[in-house]
Structure formats: structure tokens, C-alpha cells
């Protein structure tokens, strides 16, 4: 488990699939995740996650974001993970989603992100972490910049949603920048 001040990041378990299914079928949540909304059956979700709940492919790995509870289990509110881990060049792309609307804009995503970056830089010894965010997602852009990500470039008209194309902003943070900004973040905790 990885702990932030507000959040805990943990392995996805079978009982978490109901929350994931709810988020995948929430048109607004998926819009901000930059995924075209389509209804996903519970069977499709079970097939997508069933075999790999606690397994990592080595190049991709997903964790659940929960509210931090000192005793017991917190509320499931989102997911975070890396994709295309490149160990040779020491970088990866990450993505996160707060699926529970009651937690949007309240700092839970930023808290989970900072805790996860601590893990990626300290435990996986990465040099750079990067992400893509659609230009219309101003709340996410502000949050990523406040967490120390800089804008590296733009994939013009990269994502097609709701009948139109949107630019995708490429952002990254380097290990040295993270350590300077967050010297207090120990591996796996905050």
C-alpha cells in the first residue's frame, strides 16, 4: 500500500469491480478520462480485470485510490497506474481518475498523485513520469501543474470526443524536480 495524507493506494480486488463498473458507465467521468462513453457490461469488466486484479504485466500496473482511514478501509474513489513502463530509459506514462464525483476538485487526486510519484521515483527509480491530458480538462491541468508537472508539448486534435477533436497536452515531471519540490515524501508514504 502507498499512503498519502488523504488517500491510500492499494491493489484492486474483486469487490472493487462494482465501483469500477459504475465509473466506466458514468458518461461525465469517462469524458474527463477522455474515453468515448459506451456502456460496459459487468461481464466485460470482469473479463477486463478478472485475470489481472493483483497482477502487473511489468509494463503496466493499476492501483485503486481510497480515502485514507486510520482504522479500517476507506471509501473507493478512483484509480491510478502506469502504462508503458520503460525501465531502460527510466520513464513511464501515468493516468489517474477520480470516479466518485463527490471527491472531484477536493485535492484527493493531487494527494494520490504525489504519493504515487514518491513510489515511482523512490521505489522504481524512474527519471521521468509523464502524462496526457485533454486541453478542455482545465481542472486536471491546474492540478498537474500544482503538483510540479510542466507542459512538454501538444498532440494537436488528438482525441475525438462528442463529435469533435481536442488537443492532448503532454506533461512531465523529472525525478530531481520532484525531490526538490517534495523532499518530505518518503518512499510509499506522505
Question: Locations of the language-model features?
Answer:
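GNAT-family acyltransferases
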Residues: 1-102, 173-190
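Conserved active-site tyrosine of GNAT-family acetyltransferases
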Residues: 144, 149, 171
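Amphipathic alpha-helical recognition patches that constitute DNA-binding helices
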Residues: 19, 93, 111, 128, ...
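Short, conserved glycine- and acidic-residue-centered signature motifs
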Residues: 87, 109, 113, 164
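Conserved acetyl-CoA-binding loop-helix of GNAT-fold acetyltransferases
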Residues: 105-119, 138-146
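A short coil/beta-turn micro-motif at the C-terminal edge
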Residues: 14, 135-137, 165
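Conserved GNAT acetyl-CoA-binding A-motif
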Residues: 122-132
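Conserved catalytic-core motifs of GNAT/GCN5-like acyltransferases
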Residues: 130-133, 150-166
Amino acid at each position: 500500500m502507498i499512503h498519502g495524507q488523504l488517500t491510500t493506494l492499494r491493489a484492486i480486488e474483486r469487490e472493487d469491480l462494482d465501483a469500477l463498473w459504475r465509473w466506466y458507465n458514468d458518461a461525465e467521468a469517462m469524458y474527463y478520462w477522455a474515453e468515448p462513453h459506451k456502456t460496459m457490461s459487468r461481464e466485460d469488466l470482469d473479463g477486463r480485470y478478472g485475470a489481472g486484479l493483483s497482477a502487473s504485466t511489468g509494463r503496466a500496473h493499476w492501483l485503486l485510490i481510497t480515502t485514507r482511514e486510520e482504522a479500517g478501509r476507506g471509501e473507493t474513489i478512483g484509480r491510478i497506474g502506469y502504462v508503458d513502463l520503460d525501465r531502460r530509459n527510466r520513464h513511464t506514462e501515468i493516468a489517474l481518475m477520480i470516479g466518485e464525483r463527490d471527491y472531484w476538485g477536493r485535492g484527493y487526486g493531487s494527494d494520490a498523485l504525489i504519493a504515487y510519484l514518491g513510489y515511482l521515483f523512490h521505489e522504481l527509480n524512474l527519471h521521468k513520469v509523464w502524462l496526457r491530458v485533454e486541453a478542455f480538462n482545465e481542472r486536471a491541468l491546474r492540478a498537474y501543474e500544482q503538483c510540479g508537472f510542466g507542459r512538454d508539448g501538444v498532440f494537436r486534435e488528438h482525441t475525438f470526443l462528442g463529435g469533435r477533436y481536442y488537443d492532448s497536452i503532454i506533461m512531465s515531471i523529472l525525478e530531481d524536480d520532484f525531490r526538490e519540490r517534495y523532499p518530505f515524501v518518503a518512499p510509499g508514504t506522505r
